[in-house]
């Protein structure tokens, strides 16, 4: 399972604010007026501006589909496969003004099989998101969380993937490289 946010919010009578940009004035005002302690931003590839980071009482938490500080940036699932990593994971962290640089609350590892595809890894990452939230929820609502700064000396940044990055060239690529590219 996937849960569609519109249906979930309607079923549970939860106010839903939609916007194409996380920093819109209406979004910031809705967050402030809600009295939220924490705001979760998951699956949003925009950088939250300072007014959003300051709107909830405690801050903004994000999920990133790598074990930060490795793999800051974009296209985490394809890159994990392309790099031949044995595992990746999910990081719950407090957002700051940087790109995936905030202090870490918790992480959940995800094994990458030899035949992993982007689809299967995406599904594993979704399950890890849920497991991670369940694991930290009590500490989060009782204000017993511990944030650990990231070790910037261990950080790597992965760039966005472009259509031409998926081009297969059988003249210069090995069969293994082509296989990896197709699966990613």
Where are these predicted regions, by residue range?
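One-carbon transfer enzymes
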Residues: 1-184
